[in-house]
Every structure is written in C-alpha cells, then in structure tokens.
A protein has these predicted regions:
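N-terminal single-pass transmembrane signal-anchor helix
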Residues: 1-24
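Single, functionally critical "micro-switch" positions that shape active/binding sites
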Residues: 4, 38, 84
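Short linear sequence motifs
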Residues: 14, 20, 43, 80-83, ...
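Conserved hydrophobic/amphipathic alpha-helical signal-anchor segments
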Residues: 17-68
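Periplasmic/extracellular, small/polar-rich flexible segments of pilin-like filament-forming proteins
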Residues: 49-125
Length: 125
C-alpha cells in the first residue's frame, strides 16, 4: 500500500468516526428530551391523582402539594432529575401549592426552550 492510499483510508475512517459521534450525540439529546418529558408527565399525573383523591379542584390551594406528590411512600418516590442537566421548577406559573388548571404544567424544565424539554401537546394534562 502506498502512502497516498493509506492517507485516503485514514481520512475515510476519520470521516466515518466523526459522523458516528455526531449521530450518537443527537441520539443522546433525543433520549434525554424523551426521559425529561416522561418525568414531567409522571409528576403531572401524580399531581392530578392527588388533587382528585383529596378533592382539590384546579386553581385550589393544596398545602405542601409538592411534598404530597414526591417523597418516600408518595406517588413519586424521589425528586426527578433532568437527564440533560436542566433544573426542574414546580408551580412556576400558579404557585407551588396551587393545583394548576388543565393543560398547564405543574413541573417545568429549565431546558424547555433551548433543548425542547417540553411536551408538544398538554391540553388533557
């Protein structure tokens, strides 16, 4: 094999490795986004279940709502963490102890705008 052929083979291999890294990075971002949305959905379900069980209507004040949903022996055992490195905030729009109206998220991710860690459709949530 000549030096030129060897150089071409190395360049092709490096190009393929580069494409592989970009693909893996895109896959990781997508899986982080999906898991983040699952966390948001689970907390939303837990909040709705708690409010239905104890008779809190949307917009009502539910004392210690976050600690009633998340914790040992609760609907969600541990506080979720965003796999993409974002931070979750609870009750950002209506308050931590207020049951939000239907279609409004109780927990939001700080990466919702930059990495789209936000569900596309939430009217029934």
């Amino acid at each position: 094999m000549t030096l030129l052929e060897l150089t071409v083979v190395i360049l092709v291999l490096l190009t393929l490795i580069t494409v592989l890294f970009f693909g893996a990075q895109a896959w990781k971002r997508g899986s982080d986004r999906a898991l983040c949305i699952i966390h948001i959905h689970n907390v939303q379900k837990g909040m709705r279940s708690y409010s239905n069980l104890y008779g809190f209507s949307p917009g009502a004040n539910a004392p210690n709502l976050q600690s009633q949903i998340i914790g040992l022996g609760r609907v969600i055992e541990t506080t979720p963490t965003c796999p993409g490195g974002g931070n979750y905030t609870f009750g950002q729009t209506y308050g931590v102890d207020t049951v939000p109206p239907m279609g409004t998220l109780y927990m939001e991710c700080s990466l919702s705008s930059s990495f789209q860690h936000l569900p596309n459709v939430t009217p029934d949530w």
